[in-house]
């Protein structure tokens, strides 16, 4: 990473960290920009295979810049839209120079969420972190590890303009999620930035 001093580190134990910060003011979205990015969402929510069966993802999702591979499936990338390109440029300057891909998720209301998971790193460039930027409705961003009585969780508020950075070694140990809740009635857009190998 390039400028860690701009982000607040949270100690997770065992030498692992989770970093939190804010977008610079010039990159925050006003209501018109949020509405324009919201209009980019796909018409149909994607499906993934779980236990051999297709399950519809509980949010809209689209990859930009580089194909996104997860659970043995590939989400073909579209060109990076001008509305979100400044976020990719900023992350390349301020977080890590090899970040080259975006995954945008659109959440609406209480039924949209993402469950606990580790990001697949097989196709990621060595040493690149995972960067997530939040816009719109504030949601909980949860880290968790272990199961049953041994399960640990840490919650962080993903408010408008919040930036979270998950180093690769942290992703290997801790899962992350955006839980569902009846109290969420608005819209949220998350932009996740990663660094993938090019050329397959």
Explain the meaning of each model-derived region:
Residues 1-200:
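Non-heme Fe(II) oxygenase metal-center motifs and adjacent flexible, charged/small-residue loops
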């Amino acid at each position: 990473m390039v400028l860690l001093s701009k982000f607040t580190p949270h100690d997770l134990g065992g030498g692992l960290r989770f970093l939190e910060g804010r977008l610079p003011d010039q990159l925050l979205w006003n209501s018109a920009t949020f509405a324009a990015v919201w209009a980019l969402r796909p018409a149909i929510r994607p499906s993934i295979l779980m236990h051999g069966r297709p399950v519809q993802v509980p949010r809209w999702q689209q990859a930009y810049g580089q194909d996104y591979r997860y659970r043995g499936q590939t989400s073909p990338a579209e060109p990076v839209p001008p509305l979100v390109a400044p976020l990719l440029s900023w992350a390349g300057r301020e977080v890590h120079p090899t970040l080259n891909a975006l995954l945008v998720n659109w959440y609406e209301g209480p039924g949209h969420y993402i469950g606990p998971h580790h990001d697949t790193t097989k196709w990621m460039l060595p040493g690149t972190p995972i960067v997530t930027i939040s816009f719109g409705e504030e949601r909980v961003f949860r880290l968790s590890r272990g199961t049953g009585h041994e399960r640990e969780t840490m919650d962080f508020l993903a408010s408008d303009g919040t930036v979270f950075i998950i180093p690769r070694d942290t992703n290997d140990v801790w899962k992350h999620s955006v839980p569902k809740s009846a109290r969420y009635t608005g819209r949220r857009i998350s932009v996740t930035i990663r660094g993938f190998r090019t050329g397959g």
